[in-house]
Protein backbone atom coordinates (compact mmCIF):
# COMPACT_ATOMS: atom_id res chain seq x y z
CA UNK A 1 0.00 0.00 0.00
CA UNK A 2 1.24 3.50 -0.83
CA UNK A 3 2.82 5.41 2.05
CA UNK A 4 2.42 9.19 2.25
CA UNK A 5 3.51 11.98 4.58
CA UNK A 6 1.21 14.55 6.19
CA UNK A 7 2.32 17.52 8.30
CA UNK A 8 0.55 19.80 10.79
CA UNK A 9 1.81 22.61 13.00
CA UNK A 10 0.94 24.19 16.33
CA UNK A 11 2.14 27.31 18.12
CA UNK A 12 2.52 28.27 21.76
CA UNK A 13 0.47 30.85 23.62
CA UNK A 14 3.37 33.30 23.17
CA UNK A 15 3.20 33.34 19.37
CA UNK A 16 2.19 36.88 18.29
CA UNK A 17 -0.97 35.76 16.48
CA UNK A 18 -2.01 33.70 19.51
CA UNK A 19 -1.44 36.65 21.84
CA UNK A 20 -3.91 38.57 19.67
CA UNK A 21 -6.42 35.70 19.79
CA UNK A 22 -6.17 35.49 23.58
CA UNK A 23 -6.67 39.23 24.00
CA UNK A 24 -9.74 39.19 21.74
CA UNK A 25 -11.26 36.22 23.57
CA UNK A 26 -10.37 37.72 26.95
CA UNK A 27 -12.40 40.81 26.05
CA UNK A 28 -15.26 38.60 24.80
CA UNK A 29 -15.31 36.64 28.07
CA UNK A 30 -15.34 39.80 30.18
CA UNK A 31 -18.39 41.06 28.30
CA UNK A 32 -20.25 37.73 28.32
CA UNK A 33 -19.65 37.37 32.06
CA UNK A 34 -21.74 40.50 32.68
CA UNK A 35 -24.09 40.30 29.70
CA UNK A 36 -24.51 36.87 28.06
CA UNK A 37 -26.37 38.50 25.17
CA UNK A 38 -23.38 40.66 24.21
CA UNK A 39 -22.67 40.98 20.50
CA UNK A 40 -18.93 41.08 20.07
CA UNK A 41 -16.52 41.21 17.14
CA UNK A 42 -13.13 42.29 18.44
CA UNK A 43 -9.85 42.25 16.52
CA UNK A 44 -6.38 42.76 17.98
CA UNK A 45 -3.14 43.87 16.37
CA UNK A 46 0.05 43.57 18.40
CA UNK A 47 3.44 44.86 17.32
CA UNK A 48 6.61 46.19 18.91
CA UNK A 49 5.54 47.99 22.09
CA UNK A 50 1.95 48.51 20.97
CA UNK A 51 -1.46 46.82 21.04
CA UNK A 52 -4.40 48.05 18.96
CA UNK A 53 -7.91 46.75 19.69
CA UNK A 54 -10.75 47.49 17.28
CA UNK A 55 -14.16 46.13 16.44
CA UNK A 56 -17.88 46.28 17.03
CA UNK A 57 -19.62 45.62 20.35
CA UNK A 58 -23.23 45.93 21.48
CA UNK A 59 -23.63 45.13 25.17
CA UNK A 60 -24.93 46.20 28.57
CA UNK A 61 -21.60 45.19 30.12
CA UNK A 62 -18.40 47.11 30.77
CA UNK A 63 -14.92 45.75 30.17
CA UNK A 64 -11.67 47.48 31.12
CA UNK A 65 -10.00 46.64 27.83
CA UNK A 66 -6.51 48.06 28.54
CA UNK A 67 -6.35 46.06 31.79
CA UNK A 68 -7.44 42.88 30.00
CA UNK A 69 -4.78 43.46 27.35
CA UNK A 70 -2.00 43.95 29.90
CA UNK A 71 -3.07 41.06 32.12
CA UNK A 72 -3.25 38.67 29.18
CA UNK A 73 0.21 39.60 27.94
CA UNK A 74 1.77 39.36 31.39
CA UNK A 75 0.09 36.01 32.10
CA UNK A 76 1.61 34.62 28.91
CA UNK A 77 5.05 35.65 30.17
CA UNK A 78 5.92 38.83 28.29
CA UNK A 79 7.10 40.99 31.17
CA UNK A 80 10.32 42.42 29.79
CA UNK A 81 11.53 43.96 26.55
CA UNK A 82 14.31 41.35 26.64
CA UNK A 83 11.61 38.77 25.90
CA UNK A 84 10.18 40.77 23.02
CA UNK A 85 7.41 42.62 24.86
CA UNK A 86 6.43 44.07 28.23
CA UNK A 87 2.73 44.00 29.06
CA UNK A 88 3.20 46.49 31.87
CA UNK A 89 4.62 49.29 29.73
CA UNK A 90 3.24 48.73 26.22
CA UNK A 91 0.92 51.21 24.58
CA UNK A 92 -2.75 50.22 24.21
CA UNK A 93 -5.21 51.89 21.85
CA UNK A 94 -8.90 51.01 21.66
CA UNK A 95 -11.36 51.78 18.86
CA UNK A 96 -14.71 50.08 19.47
CA UNK A 97 -18.01 50.89 17.75
CA UNK A 98 -21.44 49.26 17.89
CA UNK A 99 -22.74 46.42 15.73
CA UNK A 100 -24.28 47.48 12.43
CA UNK A 101 -28.05 47.90 12.71
CA UNK A 102 -28.41 46.12 9.37
CA UNK A 103 -26.68 43.02 10.73
CA UNK A 104 -28.48 43.23 14.07
CA UNK A 105 -31.95 43.22 12.50
CA UNK A 106 -31.22 39.93 10.74
CA UNK A 107 -29.87 38.30 13.88
CA UNK A 108 -32.62 39.57 16.19
CA UNK A 109 -35.51 39.20 13.75
CA UNK A 110 -34.82 36.31 11.40
CA UNK A 111 -36.21 35.90 7.90
CA UNK A 112 -38.52 33.09 9.06
CA UNK A 113 -40.12 35.36 11.66
CA UNK A 114 -40.33 38.44 9.43
CA UNK A 115 -42.09 36.54 6.64
CA UNK A 116 -44.51 34.76 8.97
CA UNK A 117 -43.11 31.35 8.05
CA UNK A 118 -42.61 30.48 11.72
CA UNK A 119 -43.39 31.73 15.20
CA UNK A 120 -40.90 29.44 16.96
CA UNK A 121 -38.53 31.18 19.35
CA UNK A 122 -35.66 29.21 17.81
CA UNK A 123 -36.56 30.67 14.42
CA UNK A 124 -36.33 34.22 15.76
CA UNK A 125 -32.52 34.35 15.65
CA UNK A 126 -30.95 34.46 12.21
CA UNK A 127 -27.40 33.61 11.29
CA UNK A 128 -25.00 36.50 11.88
CA UNK A 129 -23.44 36.05 8.45
CA UNK A 130 -23.47 33.89 5.38
CA UNK A 131 -20.84 31.20 4.94
CA UNK A 132 -19.96 27.54 5.24
CA UNK A 133 -18.46 25.84 8.28
CA UNK A 134 -16.76 22.46 8.55
CA UNK A 135 -16.27 19.93 11.32
CA UNK A 136 -14.15 16.80 11.32
CA UNK A 137 -13.43 13.72 13.41
CA UNK A 138 -11.51 10.50 12.84
CA UNK A 139 -10.49 7.44 14.81
CA UNK A 140 -6.73 8.10 14.74
CA UNK A 141 -6.53 9.25 18.39
CA UNK A 142 -8.65 8.80 21.54
CA UNK A 143 -9.89 12.39 21.18
CA UNK A 144 -10.94 11.57 17.58
CA UNK A 145 -8.54 14.06 16.01
CA UNK A 146 -5.97 13.64 13.23
CA UNK A 147 -2.66 12.38 14.60
CA UNK A 148 -0.39 15.18 13.24
CA UNK A 149 -2.28 18.11 14.79
CA UNK A 150 -2.97 16.20 18.02
CA UNK A 151 0.73 15.52 18.54
CA UNK A 152 1.78 19.02 17.44
CA UNK A 153 -0.55 20.52 20.08
CA UNK A 154 0.82 18.19 22.76
CA UNK A 155 4.35 19.32 21.98
CA UNK A 156 3.52 23.04 21.95
CA UNK A 157 1.69 22.73 25.29
CA UNK A 158 4.68 20.88 26.74
CA UNK A 159 7.06 23.52 25.37
CA UNK A 160 5.12 26.22 27.21
CA UNK A 161 4.84 24.06 30.35
CA UNK A 162 8.59 23.50 30.76
CA UNK A 163 9.14 27.24 30.32
CA UNK A 164 6.51 28.20 32.87
CA UNK A 165 7.67 25.62 35.42
CA UNK A 166 11.32 26.60 35.05
CA UNK A 167 12.38 23.15 33.87
CA UNK A 168 14.08 24.83 30.90
CA UNK A 169 14.52 28.31 32.36
CA UNK A 170 16.14 30.00 29.37
CA UNK A 171 13.12 29.49 27.09
CA UNK A 172 10.98 32.49 26.11
CA UNK A 173 7.21 32.52 25.33
CA UNK A 174 7.29 32.42 21.52
CA UNK A 175 7.43 28.97 19.97
CA UNK A 176 6.17 26.63 17.26
CA UNK A 177 6.01 22.89 16.68
CA UNK A 178 5.48 20.84 13.55
CA UNK A 179 4.87 17.11 13.18
CA UNK A 180 5.12 14.95 10.06
CA UNK A 181 3.41 11.55 10.19
CA UNK A 182 3.73 8.73 7.68
CA UNK A 183 0.45 7.16 6.58
CA UNK A 184 -0.28 3.79 5.05
CA UNK A 185 -3.57 4.38 3.32
CA UNK A 186 -5.69 6.15 5.93
CA UNK A 187 -3.74 4.76 8.90
CA UNK A 188 -0.91 6.66 10.65
CA UNK A 189 2.02 4.26 11.02
CA UNK A 190 5.24 6.17 11.74
CA UNK A 191 6.46 9.45 13.17
CA UNK A 192 8.68 10.91 10.45
CA UNK A 193 9.80 14.39 11.58
CA UNK A 194 9.43 16.64 14.62
CA UNK A 195 10.31 20.33 14.33
CA UNK A 196 10.51 22.60 17.38
CA UNK A 197 11.35 26.29 17.16
CA UNK A 198 11.54 28.10 20.48
CA UNK A 199 12.54 31.59 21.44
CA UNK A 200 15.40 31.52 23.94
CA UNK A 201 17.69 33.74 25.98
CA UNK A 202 20.94 35.02 24.50
CA UNK A 203 24.08 32.87 24.41
CA UNK A 204 22.29 29.52 24.52
CA UNK A 205 24.09 26.76 22.64
CA UNK A 206 21.84 25.04 20.12
CA UNK A 207 23.85 21.83 19.97
CA UNK A 208 24.96 21.32 23.57
CA UNK A 209 21.98 22.73 25.49
CA UNK A 210 18.79 23.57 23.60
CA UNK A 211 18.49 20.47 21.42
CA UNK A 212 19.18 17.98 24.26
CA UNK A 213 16.78 19.83 26.57
CA UNK A 214 14.01 19.89 23.96
CA UNK A 215 14.52 16.19 23.25
CA UNK A 216 14.48 15.22 26.94
CA UNK A 217 11.90 17.58 28.43
CA UNK A 218 9.54 18.38 25.56
CA UNK A 219 9.50 15.54 23.06
CA UNK A 220 10.28 12.41 25.08
CA UNK A 221 7.39 12.81 27.58
CA UNK A 222 4.88 13.19 24.74
CA UNK A 223 6.26 10.72 22.20
CA UNK A 224 7.70 7.83 24.19
CA UNK A 225 4.99 5.38 25.07
CA UNK A 226 2.53 7.20 22.82
CA UNK A 227 1.21 3.91 21.51
CA UNK A 228 -1.72 4.21 19.11
CA UNK A 229 0.15 1.88 16.76
CA UNK A 230 2.60 4.61 15.76
CA UNK A 231 6.28 3.76 15.24
CA UNK A 232 8.20 6.52 17.03
CA UNK A 233 11.71 5.12 16.55
CA UNK A 234 14.28 6.94 14.43
CA UNK A 235 12.24 10.06 13.69
CA UNK A 236 14.10 13.15 12.49
CA UNK A 237 14.37 15.99 15.03
CA UNK A 238 14.91 19.60 13.97
CA UNK A 239 15.36 22.26 16.68
CA UNK A 240 15.61 25.95 15.74
CA UNK A 241 16.89 25.23 12.24
CA UNK A 242 17.65 28.93 11.65
CA UNK A 243 20.39 28.54 14.28
CA UNK A 244 19.12 31.24 16.65
CA UNK A 245 15.75 32.50 17.92
CA UNK A 246 16.50 35.30 20.38
CA UNK A 247 14.24 37.98 18.89
CA UNK A 248 10.67 36.73 19.22
CA UNK A 249 7.17 37.66 20.19
CA UNK A 250 5.70 40.90 18.80
CA UNK A 251 9.21 42.34 18.47
CA UNK A 252 9.96 39.72 15.83
CA UNK A 253 6.57 39.57 14.09
CA UNK A 254 3.33 41.50 14.32
CA UNK A 255 0.37 39.45 15.54
CA UNK A 256 -3.25 39.55 14.39
CA UNK A 257 -6.45 37.92 15.57
CA UNK A 258 -7.61 35.08 13.33
CA UNK A 259 -4.37 34.26 11.52
CA UNK A 260 -3.98 30.74 12.91
CA UNK A 261 -7.27 29.19 11.76
CA UNK A 262 -5.63 25.94 10.64
CA UNK A 263 -3.82 25.56 13.97
CA UNK A 264 -7.16 26.27 15.65
CA UNK A 265 -8.91 23.45 13.81
CA UNK A 266 -7.53 20.27 12.19
CA UNK A 267 -4.04 21.17 11.03
CA UNK A 268 -5.03 21.21 7.37
CA UNK A 269 -6.29 17.63 7.50
CA UNK A 270 -9.88 18.75 6.89
CA UNK A 271 -11.43 21.64 4.99
CA UNK A 272 -12.02 25.06 6.52
CA UNK A 273 -14.77 27.54 5.69
CA UNK A 274 -12.42 30.50 6.14
CA UNK A 275 -13.95 32.21 9.18
CA UNK A 276 -11.83 32.77 12.28
CA UNK A 277 -13.12 32.18 15.82
CA UNK A 278 -11.49 34.42 18.42
CA UNK A 279 -13.16 37.65 19.46
CA UNK A 280 -16.56 36.57 18.12
CA UNK A 281 -19.64 35.92 20.24
CA UNK A 282 -21.70 32.80 19.40
CA UNK A 283 -24.24 34.64 17.26
CA UNK A 284 -21.45 34.55 14.68
CA UNK A 285 -21.88 31.19 12.96
CA UNK A 286 -18.23 31.30 11.91
CA UNK A 287 -17.61 30.17 15.46
CA UNK A 288 -20.75 28.52 16.81
CA UNK A 289 -21.53 26.47 13.70
CA UNK A 290 -17.91 25.30 13.39
CA UNK A 291 -18.18 24.06 16.98
CA UNK A 292 -21.49 22.39 16.13
CA UNK A 293 -19.98 20.66 13.10
CA UNK A 294 -17.17 19.24 15.25
CA UNK A 295 -19.89 18.00 17.62
CA UNK A 296 -21.73 16.37 14.71
CA UNK A 297 -18.65 14.76 13.17
CA UNK A 298 -17.34 13.48 16.49
CA UNK A 299 -20.67 11.89 17.35
CA UNK A 300 -20.86 10.20 13.93
CA UNK A 301 -17.45 8.60 14.52
CA UNK A 302 -18.19 7.80 18.18
CA UNK A 303 -21.39 6.07 17.08
CA UNK A 304 -19.38 3.79 14.81
CA UNK A 305 -21.14 5.09 11.70
CA UNK A 306 -17.80 5.94 10.07
CA UNK A 307 -14.08 5.93 10.89
CA UNK A 308 -13.77 9.50 9.66
CA UNK A 309 -16.37 12.16 9.07
CA UNK A 310 -16.35 15.67 7.67
CA UNK A 311 -19.52 17.72 8.07
CA UNK A 312 -20.34 20.98 6.28
CA UNK A 313 -23.18 23.36 7.06
CA UNK A 314 -23.98 26.64 5.29
CA UNK A 315 -26.09 29.66 6.25
CA UNK A 316 -27.61 32.78 4.73
CA UNK A 317 -27.31 35.93 6.83
CA UNK A 318 -30.54 36.64 8.68
CA UNK A 319 -32.02 33.13 8.18
CA UNK A 320 -32.32 30.66 11.04
CA UNK A 321 -32.37 27.41 9.09
CA UNK A 322 -29.20 26.25 7.32
CA UNK A 323 -29.28 26.36 3.54
CA UNK A 324 -27.37 23.08 3.24
CA UNK A 325 -25.82 20.16 5.11
CA UNK A 326 -23.18 17.83 3.66
CA UNK A 327 -21.64 14.71 5.20
CA UNK A 328 -18.47 13.09 3.80
CA UNK A 329 -17.11 9.81 5.21
CA UNK A 330 -14.33 9.05 2.70
CA UNK A 331 -15.48 5.48 2.13
CA UNK A 332 -15.23 4.56 5.83
CA UNK A 333 -18.99 4.50 6.54
CA UNK A 334 -20.67 1.44 8.05
CA UNK A 335 -24.14 2.47 6.84
CA UNK A 336 -25.05 4.45 3.70
CA UNK A 337 -24.02 8.10 3.89
CA UNK A 338 -27.59 9.16 3.07
CA UNK A 339 -28.77 7.50 6.29
CA UNK A 340 -26.05 9.23 8.28
CA UNK A 341 -27.04 12.61 6.84
CA UNK A 342 -30.71 11.98 7.56
CA UNK A 343 -29.88 10.92 11.12
CA UNK A 344 -27.85 14.09 11.65
CA UNK A 345 -30.80 16.26 10.58
CA UNK A 346 -33.08 14.41 13.01
CA UNK A 347 -30.72 14.35 16.00
CA UNK A 348 -29.13 17.82 15.74
CA UNK A 349 -30.90 21.18 15.52
CA UNK A 350 -28.52 23.40 13.57
CA UNK A 351 -30.39 26.68 13.86
CA UNK A 352 -28.06 29.25 15.52
CA UNK A 353 -30.26 29.70 18.61
CA UNK A 354 -30.47 25.92 19.08
CA UNK A 355 -26.70 25.51 18.75
CA UNK A 356 -26.13 28.25 21.33
CA UNK A 357 -28.67 26.63 23.67
CA UNK A 358 -27.46 23.04 23.30
CA UNK A 359 -23.75 23.83 23.58
CA UNK A 360 -24.24 26.52 26.27
CA UNK A 361 -22.23 29.02 24.27
CA UNK A 362 -23.17 32.24 26.08
CA UNK A 363 -20.84 31.38 28.98
CA UNK A 364 -17.45 33.16 29.31
CA UNK A 365 -15.45 30.11 28.21
CA UNK A 366 -13.53 31.35 25.22
CA UNK A 367 -10.16 32.41 26.62
CA UNK A 368 -9.26 28.77 27.14
CA UNK A 369 -10.00 28.00 23.49
CA UNK A 370 -7.61 30.64 22.16
CA UNK A 371 -4.41 28.56 22.31
CA UNK A 372 -3.64 24.89 21.58
CA UNK A 373 -6.69 24.21 19.46
CA UNK A 374 -10.45 24.62 19.76
CA UNK A 375 -10.98 20.90 19.13
CA UNK A 376 -9.68 17.68 20.62
CA UNK A 377 -9.39 18.92 24.22
CA UNK A 378 -12.02 17.24 26.35
CA UNK A 379 -12.40 19.99 28.93
CA UNK A 380 -15.66 20.44 30.88
CA UNK A 381 -16.49 23.71 29.12
CA UNK A 382 -15.84 22.31 25.62
CA UNK A 383 -19.37 21.00 25.18
CA UNK A 384 -18.82 20.40 21.46
CA UNK A 385 -16.40 17.59 22.39
CA UNK A 386 -19.21 15.60 24.02
CA UNK A 387 -20.39 12.38 22.37
CA UNK A 388 -23.80 12.65 24.02
CA UNK A 389 -25.71 12.19 20.75
CA UNK A 390 -23.85 9.08 19.53
CA UNK A 391 -26.45 6.60 20.77
CA UNK A 392 -29.29 8.58 19.19
CA UNK A 393 -27.44 8.80 15.88
CA UNK A 394 -26.78 5.07 15.89
CA UNK A 395 -30.42 4.32 16.60
CA UNK A 396 -31.83 6.67 13.96
CA UNK A 397 -29.32 5.50 11.34
CA UNK A 398 -30.28 1.89 12.01
CA UNK A 399 -26.72 0.79 12.70
Swiss-Prot record:
Residues 99-109 are annotated as: Flexible loop. ATP binds at residues 15, 174-176, 244-245, 253, 259-260, 276, 280. Its EC number is 2.5.1.6. Binds 2 divalent ions per subunit. Binds 1 potassium ion per subunit. K(+) binds at residue 43. It comes from the Bacteria. GO terms for biological process: one-carbon metabolic process; S-adenosylmethionine biosynthetic process. One of its GO terms (molecular function) is methionine adenosyltransferase activity. Its cofactor is Mg(2+); K(+). It catalyses: L-methionine + ATP + H2O = S-adenosyl-L-methionine + phosphate + diphosphate. Mg(2+) binds at residue 17. Keywords: ATP-binding, Cytoplasm, Magnesium, Metal-binding, Nucleotide-binding, One-carbon metabolism, Potassium, Transferase. It is found in: Cytoplasm. Its main location: cytoplasm. Disulfide bonds: none annotated. L-methionine binds at residues 56, 99, 253, 284. Pathway: Amino-acid biosynthesis; S-adenosyl-L-methionine biosynthesis; S-adenosyl-L-methionine from L-methionine: step 1/1. One of its GO terms (cellular component) is cytoplasm. PROSITE patterns: ADOMET_SYNTHASE_1, ADOMET_SYNTHASE_2. NCBIfam families: metK. Catalyzes the formation of S-adenosylmethionine (AdoMet) from methionine and ATP. The overall synthetic reaction is composed of two sequential steps, AdoMet formation and the subsequent tripolyphosphate hydrolysis which occurs prior to release of AdoMet from the enzyme. Homotetramer; dimer of dimers. Belongs to the AdoMet synthase family. This is S-adenosylmethionine synthase. It comes from Salinispora tropica (strain ATCC BAA-916 / DSM 44818 / JCM 13857 / NBRC 105044 / CNB-440).
Amino acid sequence: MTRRLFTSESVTEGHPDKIADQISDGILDALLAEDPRSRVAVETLITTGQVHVAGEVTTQAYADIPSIVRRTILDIGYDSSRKGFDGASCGVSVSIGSQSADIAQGVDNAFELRTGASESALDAQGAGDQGMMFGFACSETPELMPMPIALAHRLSRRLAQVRREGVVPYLRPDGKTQVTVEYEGLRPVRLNTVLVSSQHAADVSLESLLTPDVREHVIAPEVEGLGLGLDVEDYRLLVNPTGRFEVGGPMGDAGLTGRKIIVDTYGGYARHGGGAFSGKDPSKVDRSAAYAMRWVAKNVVAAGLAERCEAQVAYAIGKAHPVSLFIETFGTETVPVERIEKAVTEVFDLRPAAIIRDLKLTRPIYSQTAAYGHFGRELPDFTWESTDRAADLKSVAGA
